[in-house]
Amino acid sequence: MTEPGGPLSAAETVHLVRQALEGGEPMASVTVIEWRASGESSQVARAGAHLAVWSDRSRGTLGDARLDERAVELARAALSGPGRVASHEIETEAGVCVVYVEPHRPPPELVIVGAGHIARPLCAAGALLGFRVTVLDDRPEFATRERFPEAAEVRRADFADPFRGVPIGPQTYLVLVTRGHKYDFEALMDVLRRPVRPAYVGMVGSRRRTRAALEQLAREGVDPERIAAVRAPIGLDVRAETPGEIAIAIAAELVLERRGGTGRPLRDTERVYERWVRRAGE
């Protein structure tokens, strides 16, 4: 659906982006950066024209209905996947329009269940990585703003119903690091019984405890696909020992899940020495 109205100014577009992000709604902005006319054709789109696009509607115009239609398709494609800022050429009978498509998404949510020694450095790392961090714990002396100054929210929660009042959606990353395996498991069961699938669910624990938890989930009839997706034991294998090291291993896995990649050292994937330096010396 295209909402009525004429061209958008840059200020109006910025306002719509800010409004969407504050409301937790993804959107994309499309901006004309160049118009190349075909022969004697008149200029259809002018550099600086803006279009605002959501999943179900759009506002503004680039100057031509067919041009708008194609721009909306590009914007929604960027929103539906991990699309990043990109320029595209849209060909029309009158010429070629070069547009800049920029997806705008609310920051992903990182919910840390447990406010202990791993949670503190993980909260700091999560905020640094651009997550909106919420920390939950049932102990009032642990669930404090002083312990987690980087968190957007610090909540005292009942581990019998840990996510009450906490929205969980497809852009939520959940890390279960409570003071006891029993609480981790109960929170995990709560999450996996929900119809919505979070972007990431990870649980701390030894190999033995992880196996026991996953076997229990299978006995409870939880979808095997959901069980297999649980990151447990949590984090990348960097032989982490200290709370800070464990937090960094978890944070690295969050980035891997969010951005994609192999998790291997870049030295091994790029092989700069073998491909160029050593070859040049032979």
Which role fits each region the language model picked out?
Residues M1-D138, F142, E146-R155, G169-Y173, ...:
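Segments forming oxygen-rich coordination pockets for charged ligands
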Residues T31-I33, V113, D137, V177-T178, ...:
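Short beta-strand segments
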Residues A119-R120, D184-F185, T210:
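Short, well-ordered alpha-helical microsegments
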Residues C123-A125, R147-F148, P167-I168, E186-D190, ...:
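Short amphipathic alpha-helical segments
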Residues L136, Y173, T178-H181, M189-Q216:
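ADP-ribose/adenylate-binding Rossmann-like module
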Residues A157-P162, K182:
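Conserved SAM/SAH-binding loop
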Residues A160-P170:
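Short amphipathic alpha-helix with an adjacent loop that forms part of the alpha/beta core around
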Residues V204-E282:
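Adenosine-phosphate binding glycine-rich loop
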